[in-house]
């Protein structure tokens, strides 16, 4: 009696252990029309152990050991096989777990699988695109960053590759060289000297006589020559000298006479008198015959040998006059 009361005062530890066993069966033609839940069967076997112990040494630890109670449950689930019903999963609990697991993992988008792969670009599990490049000098990878699209990451990789490896580096996109700015050449103003030289050359080709300098035109046109020649002002022209006319008469004056009022008029009659005709040239001259006692014979004027003498003298006189004329002309040119 005392022993039973003592056993009831001990602390009790209650645990439950459950074991599930699945069995699959093929459904008959009659049972295929029913649903999966109606065709599933459950067999449960339970047993309670009031004096259960984990090990043989549990009773020696304490003076008053605790009481251990175990409940053992065995379940046998009989379900139709998935091949006969065409269902993907037969267990509803297992389907719930699969749905929860699939929802946590993000599957890559279909568009991302078909995208082009770029050099130095890779996709992160959460969908971003990372770019990195290897530095050959430092022998390490350089992180370039993450981007929303693969194209942005590829462009950043291309720029870094050109900086590290030069313009001949392998890139994802063909980089077109920038066109060099064309410098506009400033037109230098033509010097006045060149213009004046060209004008002087043109003038030298079209020079005319001094009488036509005032009427010279520097341009050529299709108009007639008469229209191009403009009248010259009279102040630049020299006044024409009227010819001097002599009014010979007996002292009669006219209104158009240019003579002065104090001119002597008695000379008019003198100039009006006609000279007598000389008749000596009309008569033939008789030859002069020398005589013995003639004085001019001694002068050798009529000697035959005198011709050579006088011709030599005349030549010497002519040469002296020529020298005189040449010296006078040179002196005049120097002045």
Curated annotation (Swiss-Prot):
Keywords: Activator, Cytokinin signaling pathway, Cytoplasm, DNA-binding, Ethylene signaling pathway, Nucleus, Transcription, Transcription regulation. It is found in: Cytoplasm; Nucleus. Residues 117-174 bind DNA. It comes from Arabidopsis thaliana (Mouse-ear cress). Pfam families: AP2. The keyword Chaperone does not apply. Residues 78-121, 175-209 are annotated as: Disordered. PROSITE patterns: AP2_ERF. Belongs to the AP2/ERF transcription factor family. ERF subfamily. Component of the cytokinin signaling pathway involved in cotyledons, leaves, and embryos development. Probably acts as a transcriptional activator. Binds to the GCC-box pathogenesis-related promoter element. May be involved in the regulation of gene expression by stress factors and by components of stress signal transduction pathways. It comes from the Eukaryota. One of its GO terms (molecular function) is DNA binding. One of its GO terms (biological process) is leaf development. Residues 80-92, 101-115 have a biased composition (Polar residues). The lineage of its organism: Eukaryota, Viridiplantae, Streptophyta, Embryophyta, Tracheophyta. Its main location: cytoplasm. One of its GO terms (cellular component) is cytoplasm. InterPro entries: AP2/ERF_dom, AP2/ERF_dom_sf, AP2/ERF_ERF_subfamily, DNA-bd_dom_sf. This is Ethylene-responsive transcription factor CRF4.
